[in-house]
């Protein structure tokens, strides 16, 4: 029972209780000035959570403004629950990615599960039906028992929620590096489909209209979750387990169906998910976006615990709840609709004209705050930025090609590195076929989901090589966007737009803020060049444990349009006799590479370089060749270089191999991680047409020998590897480490 007496306004100021809630002295003075008086305990809570980095982006807004956010297909950019992009035929794709890093570090199963639940709500709150889930995960090295536990529980949490709710988890990525040991990253992405006329906004228009609460009841879980996400993890974080919410996927499944039915009613004015900061953010944001106010009667909030205070109800982050505004007089229709699904829908307030958020409890007004002050007027900080000390040192290093004695052994060792190895152990736990629209299942460059009732598909991927970004944030930022687009193109899709999840350390450290600025500069430049605007996303700061930050990890979630499903292309070889081509030049670039990490146990030097003009030209050529029906298989060359890419294309096929000849110094030819490269196979009869359309070098052919043989330019064999043995090593690596 929380019947402890709340501190009064004078105590809050004199004892600096606001500081424990996350407000600085200057911020508290601003609140005092806005209100013209000292705030009470509930009001202090409202400001502390709405002005947290997690809700207000107060440290990152100046940087986020650099992103291009408009384009001819963009129907909704950043600022709503999720972004929306037109895909023709009166249809649109809705998508967004968010982090649930801090909760997952402490309570990995529920942290990951509720991350999935929250991102699904962001998508269906726009009026869209969720059709696919993806995720991007980062962990420490699997040798550590703690990391094994986090990895197994996070994957189980994602699977548990996604499988129950009946939305396929179709793709994602998992990378392992020591810097994530104490602070894993769990980024979840949801993609939905909508007809243009069904698009809804989270806005509270129309004075006198009714504010209703729908979905699950409110408990004490997740109070101050947004504030918890805006500080560094420490040993005492374990004590904050109550801040991790518990998800109920069956409740959410009912909520989706009820909300999608609700959206068809003209009674609905606005709808928003109660996510971070729960009732506070949904009410303040909906009022502020509409230029209105809201009055709420907290006695009417469905509560699953006794004696909850206004402070607790407003800050709870209990899951599976939405706030809606409906036309006055239509409330009973809404109640009946939700009752049909066994869900609560209660009237708890109304829209007002005076732009104030007013809260009443037990007949008394317990808070009166301008909605704009909470939602829009958080202070914005231009943090000091300073080039990281390591950067100049890395830039000046003379890069030497790593010494490799045995190419075959090295290839096998690379295939067994957890970052490269098969993620089948992960995605086998996910139901990626539910709804039966999945055209390309996990394991290829991008997943493809059918757009029902059409011949179109949506290609989708998450990408980010954090090592490159650590070595050179600006170049690494460009590479993250370019690689995502390359994966979409290899699957037969035209890249449309991105959502981003910016995972960084403590922005109050100038070297971290420099990483944020530079990587956003690089991403923005690539988004402009590749014409993939940023339509929404999420910032996750303070990803540190004991003062050590994670690698800068601005994850890119990209969606592309496959204009005709017959263009869908996958990475595995298709038939013996096809010609193997490599597009793009290989340089001796090993900085941040899988080979460098494997041989030295650390990364250093310069990241691979990228020329965005060249990248765009190659992507356009490859996509045109795929659409012309000239391409059998396509695979982006990424971690592990050409040897790994060719091996993966053979591993995915049945009984096929390849014989190829690679020019240049052998270690670089096999394992360097130069950008803007593709491995493509083409039917022999399409050789001339393909070579006319694409600048590519034929390096060999697909065989039915079940072996990959790679020669150097003198025709000497560098390595011969049996595909079954490679597959066994590649598939067995992660299960073996988990034993």
From Swiss-Prot:
Positions contributing to ATP binding: 57, 96, 500, 537
Keyword Ligase in record: yes
GO molecular function: ATP binding; magnesium ion binding; phosphoribosylformylglycinamidine synthase activity
Gene3D superfamilies membership: PurM-like C-terminal domain (3.90.650.10), PurM-like, N-terminal domain (3.30.1330.10)
InterPro entries associated with the record: PRibForGlyAmidine_synth_PurL, PurL_linker, PurM-like_C_dom, PurM-like_C_sf, PurM-like_N, PurM-like_N_sf
Residues that bind substrate: 99-102, 121, 245, 317-319, 540
Name of a matching Pfam family: AIRS
Pathways per UniProt: Purine metabolism; IMP biosynthesis via de novo pathway; 5-amino-1-(5-phospho-D-ribosyl)imidazole from N(2)-formyl-N(1)-(5-phospho-D-ribosyl)glycinamide: step 1/2
Major place of residence: cytoplasm
GO biological processes: 'de novo' IMP biosynthetic process
Annotated GO CC locations: cytoplasm
Function: Part of the phosphoribosylformylglycinamidine synthase complex involved in the purines biosynthetic pathway. Catalyzes the ATP-dependent conversion of formylglycinamide ribonucleotide (FGAR) and glutamine to yield formylglycinamidine ribonucleotide (FGAM) and glutamate. The FGAM synthase complex is composed of three subunits. PurQ produces an ammonia molecule by converting glutamine to glutamate. PurL transfers the ammonia molecule to FGAR to form FGAM in an ATP-dependent manner.
Name of the protein in its database record: Phosphoribosylformylglycinamidine synthase subunit PurL
